């Protein structure tokens, strides 16, 4: 039997661009739990914010006594217990957010120069920061999963020690794999990343 990849399109993005972005993580996870197919073995892959969404989704599945992912693949993300900030980045001015976005890389300059597109991107970024900057792992959560972490060697946004901190939430099966590139290394390293993901997934299934 082959492996099926199911992509998650969040409100306010891609084909759902006309919808209002979700700003509360529990609301987003509730939406995902309702549509998640759990009748076959599955794993989660999340890049940046998506890694935290995957972690919290797994936590909610555990809380509801539903099947858990057999593996959690995270990319370019700090560990969940390090997310919460005293002041959310969603409160930054447009100019401050824009500088932050430029530091991430991955967004074409043409988009940032176009007022309407730039405002749309900043709106999504604010929603993302609302999701992640006020998140904290609830007390008493002890379930551990096999976790594989990925990162770019030149990612200036997430330090390796913050990525390595994911081992706190892993079983003995934790590993880190580095690819040449920045926060969006996976754009150029897609083929190698997919090969690694499938290889690790097939090892455990």
Task: Put a short name on every predicted segment.
Residues 1-205:
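Non-catalytic, mobile gating and regulatory segments of ester bond hydrolases
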